[in-house]
Amino acid sequence: LTTPGTAIGSSRYALSEEDYARMPEIFAKWKIKYVLPTGGNGTMDTCGKIRRACEGTDIRVVGIPKTIDNDIAVTDHTPGYGSSARYLAETVAEIGADVKSLPIHVCIVEAMGRNAGWITAASALAREKKGDAPHLIYLPERPFREEEFLEDVKRLYEELGGVVVVASEGLKKENGEPIVPPIFRSGRSVYYGDVGAYLAELVIRKLGIKARSEKPGICGRASIPLQSAVDREEAVLAGRTALESALAGQTGVMVSFVREASEDGSYRMHPGTVPIEEVMMYERKVPESYINERGNDVTEEFVSWCKPLADVHHREFIDFQEYYWERKGKRE
C-alpha cells in the first residue's frame, strides 16, 4: 500500500476483436476463472467486451474502478480520486502561502483530469477562510471565456496583489475546441497542450502583470505521503468486493460505491455492483450544481461532497501581517 502506481503493471495496448475471441482459450489454458480488470473508462469498456467474449463459459468478469479522474459513471466516486484531491488541495494551500508572502504576481496551477473537472474542483478544499487560495477555479465543464478570465484576474490582483488560479488541462472554448491545441492524439489518448503556460502568458500580454505556471502532473497520483486514508481503505474494499462478487457467481458487473444519507451529516458509504453495460465508455462530468454561476469556482455543495473523501490535513500557516492587524484592531 506504499507503492505508487501499480505493482502488477499496466497497459494501453488496444485489443482487437481477434484478441477478445482468443481470450476464453487463453484463460482455459492457464486455468484462469476470475478476471478482475482494474482501471478507468477504457478498462471498464474492455471489461464489458471480455465478459461478452466469455459468455457461455464459467469465467467470471468483474470490474474494479480505479481512476484519479473520478469520471466513471454509476458510482459516487472512484478509488484514487480522494488521494489526488488531497494532494492538489494541500499543494495549492502551500502555493497560496508562498504567493501571499510576496504578492506581486499571478500563479496558474494546471490540474489533470482530461474532460472532467473533478480534480481541479478539489483544489477548493485548500481554503480555510475567506481570501485563501485558490482564488479562481476553472473546469472543462464550462466554456472558457478569455475576457471574463482576464476581468476576474485583474479585479483580484488589484484587491489582493497575489492571485492563485487553478485551471483544468481540458479547458475548452465556446465551440468545444481545447483552448490550447493538443500536442498529440492517438485513439482515446489526448496529450494536452500546456494550458497553464498559455494562461500565464495571456495574463502577462493582456494585463501586464507578472505571471507563472505550475504543473504538478502525475505527482498527484504518485504521492504516497499525501494519500487519503479514506481512499486507501476504500481501494482495498473495492478489490475485496470484486473478488467476493466473482466468487459468488456474479459476472459482467463493476463494483460501485453508494453514499448513504445520515442524520448527523457524517460520511457513510457501502459497496455494491452495477451492470458493466451502464458504465462502458460513459464519461461522468462535474454536475452544474457543483459549479458557481460565473463558472470561476465551485459551490459549497461540491465542497461538502468532496471533503470526506480527500481527508485534507490543514497545516497552520503563520502570517505576521494578519496577526499585526488583528492585534491592532483589538487595541483600538
Question: What kind of region is each of these model predictions?
Answer:
Residues L1-K33, G42-T43, I68, P79-G82, ...:
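Glycine-rich oxoanion-binding loops at beta->alpha junctions
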Residues L1-S10, K66-D76, S101-H105, P181-I183:
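Gly-rich Lys/Arg/Thr-decorated short loops/hinges at beta-loop-alpha junctions or inter-strand turns
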Residues T6-S11, L136-P140, Q227:
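Short, basic, glycine/proline-bearing loop/turn elements
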Residues R12-Y13, G40-N41, I64-N70, E141-P143, ...:
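Short, ordered loop/turn segments at secondary-structure junctions
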Residues P37-G39, D45-K49, A53-C54, D58, ...:
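Accessory alpha-helical/coil subdomains and C-terminal extensions
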Residues M44-D45, N70-D71, N115-G117, K173-N175, ...:
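Flexible loop/turn segments at secondary-structure boundaries
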Residues P178-E332:
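C-terminal non-catalytic interaction/assembly regions of soluble proteins
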